[in-house]
Amino acid sequence: MSSKKLIVILGATGNQGGSVAETFLQEPGWQVRAVTRNPSSSKAQALATRGAEVVKADLDDPSSFIPAFKGAHVIFAVSDFWGLFGDPASQGKAAAADQPLNVWAANHETEQLKGVIDAAAKVHTLERFVLSSLSNAAKWSSGKYPHVYHFDSKAKAEAYGGENHPELWAKTSIFQAGYFLSNFVSNPITLPRRFIGGLDPDVELPFIAAEEDTGPIVKAIVLDSGPKKVIGYRARISLRGLIETFSRVTGIKAEPVVLPKGESVVPFPPELQRELDDNWGYWTEFGYYGGDPTVVHPQDLEHAPKLNSVADYFKKQDWSKVFGS
């Protein structure tokens, strides 16, 4: 019988889950069980080669998590609103439900996470459940910004867990990932032509390299003596400060440009534009995590993670792929 502790990682081939897998594969005393929809993918096979146990489970099939979670000491759970939103098959499902696509994706993500939570609550060996969530924009803005669906969908599942599974929630930590630095490399909304968007450039935000930082932060969460709600980031800095760092590191002159509400550098359907407008407004007025007094920061954890800087992230990117050679 193995004396190692078992961490089960959902989304183990993605940004957040992949970082957690990478971290715990290097930790003596831990066995990694990587959960994925496609165990034969190259990323899944690479994890298996390095010693991870790769198992198949699907967020749309809650029963698949019963065997996947068996014997777990720690479970890291993550979902993907934007994956649902971008899946061509979702358009027909949203139409059949007579819902805008982003509303359908949010509702579906909430239901997926409820299934994960229900399954985790049945694991008697579990010592820590770590749920990747985000702040409830509608709640913390007192209803002023009700359309930040990709935040509230996760927060609703989090609330469900607290209300329906108090024993599980007594050993649950919440991980709120900051704004992904990778958005400045691969997201068409925020590629640095100049930064063009609706966000106040002087509002401070938490920035995270999710593919690098999630694992060390989750490790610190797991090692902490009690459950916490942690905002995950490597730096809290304004967009203006971020752009100054980008210019200093790359030598490329850059400046923020703020568009009026309702406008975007990329054309969106009205319902998504409204969501983004509410998103920028919420961050500007209430902050990334809404002023939730229960949130703690990575440096406040008992085993605070050592993370690289924003400058380090920018230095190693191939900006010719963004701007051309």
Residue ranges and their predicted role:
Residues 50, 239-292:
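Terminal hydrophobic/aromatic helix or amphipathic segment near a protein terminus
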Residues 112-115, 119:
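Short, conserved SAM-binding segment of the class I
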